[in-house]
Regions:
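Conserved N-terminal beta1-alpha1 strand-loop-helix module at the mouth
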Residues: 1-97, 115-128, 132-142, 165-176, ...
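A short acidic, helix-capping loop that chelates divalent metal ions and anchors anionic groups
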Residues: 44, 150-159
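Flexible loop residues that form catalytic
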Residues: 47, 103, 149, 212
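Gly/Pro- and small hydrophobic-enriched strand-loop and loop-to-helix capping segments
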Residues: 93-108
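Non-cysteine beta-strand/loop elements that form the S-adenosyl-L-methionine
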Residues: 101, 141-150
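Short gly/pro/ser/thr-enriched loop/turn and capping motifs at secondary-structure boundaries
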Residues: 106-107, 151-152, 214-215
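Short, flexible/disordered intra-domain loops and linkers
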Residues: 156-168
Length: 242
């Protein structure tokens, strides 16, 4: 018997994409390009589309994942919308789970509705990030999504304190974050190609990007450069530890 998606989950190269990020190109084209380049997880995120449009986007992304032959190990998630994932599944779409924020539907509720084999991710964006990651009950969660590294227009709510000030993270903080977390961590927020080698040297399990791929003139080339840089950075780090 093969692994469930929860067991096979790979967040090393994580694409977040929606219609507002693609410079007018179809979302499925960006997904296709990322898959060709070796991206391992896809999240459909849009604050501007209806539930029906989100379901359609999930369906198109699922088709691209199936066509690439990677349905067994590339997870397809929806941002925030548990209802969309449930409806998509009812319509026969292979939606693997949901990513929620700290003010969205609680992860344990998502888990109850989606089942034990689903993927449930949780954003960790707070001025007390290390304490939050260390102390949060992770029994219903598969990974944390944390950030940002730099200020970013695609996720303007990412990493603000109670006063609304943007809090970016140093590589030292990111490494400490990975050390205190009981579950895998994917890190992003303004991440670009030059950041990848240093990010790969930290203990996080992957990087997530939006505009670095979805907004690139050549999304497949940009995605491939990111994946190659991550893998090279991890290989160098692994070699240095031996």
């Amino acid at each position: 018997m093969g692994k469930t998606m929860r067991e096979a989950l790979d967040i090393s190269a994580y694409l977040v994409v929606g219609p507002e990020n693609t410079e007018g190109r179809p979302v499925r084209e960006i997904v296709r390009a990322a898959l060709k380049a070796g991206f391992s997880c896809v999240q459909i995120r849009s604050k501007e589309t209806s539930a029906r449009e989100m379901i359609a986007l999930l369906g198109e992304a699922a088709e691209e994942i199936r066509a690439a032959g990677v349905s067994e190990h590339v997870a397809l998630l929806a941002d925030d919308r548990l209802d969309v994932v449930l409806a998509a599944r009812k319509m026969g779409i292979k939606a693997d789970g949901v990513h929620v924020g700290q003010s969205d539907i609680p992860p344990e509720i998502c888990r109850a509705y989606l089942g034990e084999e689903a993927v449930v991710g949780l954003s960790a964006r707070t001025d007390e990030l290390l304490a939050y990651v260390r102390d949060t009950d992770t029994s219903a969660i598969d990974y944390f999504g944390a950030g940002p590294l730099h200020e970013t227009a695609t996720k303007p709510d990412c990493g603000r304190d109670a006063q609304g000030n943007i809090i970016t993270r140093s590589f030292e903080e990111i490494d400490e974050l990975a050390r205190v977390s009981k579950i895998p961590v994917v890190f992003g927020g303004g991440v670009k190609l030059p950041d990848i080698p240093a990010l790969a040297k930290t203990g996080v399990d992957g990087f997530f990007v939006v505009s670095a791929v979805a907004g690139a003139p050549d999304p497949e080339k940009a995605a491939k450069e990111l994946v190659d840089a991550w893998q090279a950075g991890k290989a160098a780090t692994s070699g240095a530890k031996k």
